[in-house]
UniProtKB/Swiss-Prot annotation:
Binding site for S-adenosyl-L-methionine: G77, M82, E104, K105, S106, R145
Similarity field: Belongs to the methyltransferase superfamily. RNA methyltransferase RsmG family.
Swiss-Prot/TrEMBL keywords: Cytoplasm, Methyltransferase, rRNA processing, S-adenosyl-L-methionine, Transferase
The protein's name: Ribosomal RNA small subunit methyltransferase G
Native organism: Pelagibacter ubique (strain HTCC1062)
Amino acid sequence: MEEIFKNYPLLKNQNVPRETLIEFDLFISMLQEENEKINIISKETAKNEVIRERHIVDSAQIIEFVDLNSNIITDIGSGGGMPGIIISIMIKNQKNLAKVHLYEKSHHKSSFLRKVSRDLKLNTEVMQENIFEAEKLDSGTIMARAFKPLPIILDLVYKNFNSYKNLIVFMGKNGEKVLEETLMNWDFDFEKKKSITSEDSFLLNIKKIKKKN
């Protein structure tokens, strides 16, 4: 097996092409270099063997929930580009024309996202603004990873988006409790999928968000 495939064993059943994995590694190099200047991810997770699983594969696993028929896919708190940059790399190599909107209010992180997008020729638009102040947004898939608690994310999508196809949220070890409590105040259709990178985590694919009276 070629070395690049050995670097991503958890993606071996996902049919991820070689070109995509190569660009993942290019992105990792850029992220590690920038991380020496500004704190984007923790130093512990910036090592090659850790970053691939903790950040790259963790982000890539949501691709099956991403609506690839959308014109716009939105990452509502992009940070260092996970999952937005990762999904943009994947859809580029699927010859998909969807644009990924990356919301990040930090000047330094936004500049990094623009540089990565230019260097990897990604179809993204970096929005250096606080998404909570944005209004009347439209999107296909919306993605939220390590951003805000679930109720705040739901409230943001409910109030600030005119239309959307689905919302993907990464849930951590207290996710089941958070979901149960959130459903007391919110109504939505959802599908759960166990994370391939963590025993304690799962993904939520959410549609039709409504507030309970």
